[in-house]
């Protein structure tokens, strides 16, 4: 509790943008996020009984708070401000990923991608791990700048279910309720309960996109590359579903 974490992310934003200029023309948009290796602001992985409260996060290199393969985590009263001294790419707010029994409350997020987001792994690796995101409550929260007050996906392979979100406000957020995935992801989204969601100046209140961002979501090795001579994590991404 109490304090500020400055991720000093600009150096990583600049690195990512530089790599995009190199990778995109080669048909490698799908792997650049992984090759860039941008750090998260806070990563809670394989943990139980964790509380994060009353802190301020800003300028992360990548996602601000990532809860991964964890359970019994409470996030209470945090502020995320990712638009100080620039706007970093894909600087999500809170990402709850293949985790369960999570409570997020009394938090305020301004970011440059999804504000409050649920994920469950992607593609063949997500199907292999097969860990759902479930039993999550998000309440009494505000989203300002960002791409999704409440988002499911695009990583949906393990499934997302038994989610409750209420007393949430989007103020100038690009999207309100956003569900996104692709045919490569798989997984089922079900039993999502949303109540008392207020949107002020939100461009699109409700969006469902099941062919989200094909250049990023579809992993394909361009001509001229030999699968025997690429990094191991490329092979994992290239494994067909």
Language model region names:
Residues 1-241:
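Extracellular/periplasmic carbohydrate-active domains that bind, remodel
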């Amino acid at each position: 509790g109490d304090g500020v974490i400055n991720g000093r992310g600009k150096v990583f934003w600049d690195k990512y943008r530089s790599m995009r200029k190199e990778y995109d023309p080669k048909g490698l948009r799908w792997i650049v996020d992984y090759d860039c290796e941008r750090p998260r602001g806070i990563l809670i992985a394989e943990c139980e009984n964790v509380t994060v409260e009353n802190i301020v996060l800003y300028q992360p290199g990548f996602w601000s708070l990532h809860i991964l393969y964890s359970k019994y985590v409470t996030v209470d009263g945090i502020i995320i401000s990712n638009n100080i001294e620039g706007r970093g790419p894909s600087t999500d707010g809170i990402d709850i990923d293949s985790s369960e029994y999570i409570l997020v409350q009394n938090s305020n997020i301004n970011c440059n991608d999804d504000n409050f987001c649920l994920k469950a792994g992607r593609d063949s690796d997500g199907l292999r791990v097969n860990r759902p995101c479930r039993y999550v409550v998000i309440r009494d929260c505000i989203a300002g700048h960002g791409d999704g007050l409440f988002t499911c996906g695009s990583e949906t392979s393990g499934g997302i279910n038994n989610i409750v979100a209420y007393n949430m406000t989007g103020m100038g957020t690009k999207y309100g309720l956003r569900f996104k995935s692709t045919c490569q992801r798989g997984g089922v989204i079900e039993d999502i309960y949303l109540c008392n969601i207020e949107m002020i100046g939100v461009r699109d209140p409700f969006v469902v996109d099941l062919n989200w961002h094909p250049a990023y979501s579809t992993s394909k090795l361009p001509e001229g590359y030999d699968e025997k001579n690429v990094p191991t994590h490329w092979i994992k991404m290239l494994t067909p579903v």
